[in-house]
Swiss-Prot record:
Keywords linked to the UniProt accession: Cytoplasm, Phosphotransferase system
Domain of life: Bacteria
Disulphides: none
SUPFAM superfamilies registered for this protein in UniProt: HPr-like (SSF55594)
List of catalytic residues: H17 (pros-phosphohistidine intermediate)
Function, as annotated: Component of the phosphoenolpyruvate-dependent nitrogen-metabolic phosphotransferase system (nitrogen-metabolic PTS), that seems to be involved in regulating nitrogen metabolism. The phosphoryl group from phosphoenolpyruvate (PEP) is transferred to the phosphoryl carrier protein NPr by enzyme I-Ntr. Phospho-NPr then transfers it to EIIA-Ntr. Could function in the transcriptional regulation of sigma-54 dependent operons in conjunction with the NPr (PtsO) and EIIA-Ntr (PtsN) proteins.
Species the sequence originates in: Shewanella violacea (strain JCM 10179 / CIP 106290 / LMG 19151 / DSS12)
GO biological process: phosphoenolpyruvate-dependent sugar phosphotransferase system
InterPro entries tied to this protein: HPr, HPr-like, HPr-like_sf, PTS_HPr_His_P_site
Name of protein: Phosphocarrier protein NPr
Amino acid sequence: MTKLERQVTICNKLGLHARAATKLAILASEFDAEITIVQGEKKASAASVLGLLMLETGMGKTITLLGKGQDADAALDAICALVDAKFDEAS
């Protein structure tokens, strides 16, 4: 099974805070794929809100998305779009 990788920069003011992490985890869970988020030396499942919060990812940080599974490409596209849309937050 091919592993896919993408990088995206967190651009919303509050970074990957609780509400944003929840949106990301819900989105990741919709796909038949295992998605891992990496920031520096830390890794977390994209489906784990607590794991995502433990990454302590702030505005301007670049994260790496690793995906494997049947829907990995679509999942990475959707997650990148969510991050680029600043998690649909006003600011």
